[in-house]
Amino acid sequence: MSNKDTSILKGNVDHEEADSNPKLRKIGRPPALRIIPPLNFCPVERQLYRSGQPSAINQSFLEQLNLKTILWLASEEPQDDFLEFSNDHNINIEFVGIINEFSNYQNYNTNQTLTVNPWDALNEQTIKRALELIVNRENYPLLVCCGMGRHRTGTVIGCLRRLQGWNLASVSEEYRRFTGARGGRILVELLIESFDIGSVEIDPSKVPDWLT
């Protein structure tokens, strides 16, 4: 038998083996729908999630979560396509990270005019407001997000963990897990440590099961 015949025979055997073994079958075409989570996406508790600022390629993924509320901690305003997506899916965006004419018009109910540097860390008042939204199960399923899903989101989730009774070492470890190669910010960790968790107003009739 020639080398050519041997090669053809071997090829036929390989095809037969592939047909009989599902693990060897090649995918003929890519999936029709690409499901891509936002940067640094991670579940926090049941129906509570965290991530970086979502983009258009993440919308199919977000649809699967059936979100009711997005807690927006990013210092910049959302893109128009994201606002349209949220409106089409009846998702309420709560603006906590930015306080300006845009956010006041949308959701931020306040009678005060506040000037905020977009590069500043969150202050105690904004953390308190964020946590009071999180501890209300009527807002669920809920996504907490900021620009990269690191420091602002990490601050709020860190204070939430303290509210849950976590020790500071565990809180710090979780925060740094999302900060990447640059590591955590000492000012963020100090803010988490010093935050007055007793200032958070919790309605016992609306508290999530994992906090009871």
Curated annotation (Swiss-Prot):
Looking at its record, which EC class is this enzyme?
A: hydrolase
Q: Which InterPro entries match?
A: PFA-DSPs (IPR020428), Prot-tyrosine_phosphatase-like (IPR029021), Siw14-like (IPR004861), TYR_PHOSPHATASE_DUAL_dom (IPR020422)
List the subcellular locations.
Cytoplasm
Under catalytic activity, the entry for this protein gives: O-phospho-L-tyrosyl-[protein] + H2O = L-tyrosyl-[protein] + phosphate
Please verify whether the record's keywords include Lipoprotein.
no
Active site residues according to the UniProt entry: C146
Q: Which Gene3D superfamilies match?
A: Protein tyrosine phosphatase superfamily (3.90.190.10)
Q: Name the protein family.
A: Belongs to the protein-tyrosine phosphatase family.
Tell me which PANTHER family the record gives.
TYROSINE-PROTEIN PHOSPHATASE, TYROSINE-PROTEIN PHOSPHATASE OCA1-RELATED
Q: How is this protein named in the record?
A: Putative tyrosine-protein phosphatase OCA1
- Species name for this entry? Scheffersomyces stipitis (strain ATCC 58785 / CBS 6054 / NBRC 10063 / NRRL Y-11545) (Yeast)
- Which lineage do the record's taxonomy fields give for this organism? Eukaryota, Fungi, Dikarya, Ascomycota, Saccharomycotina
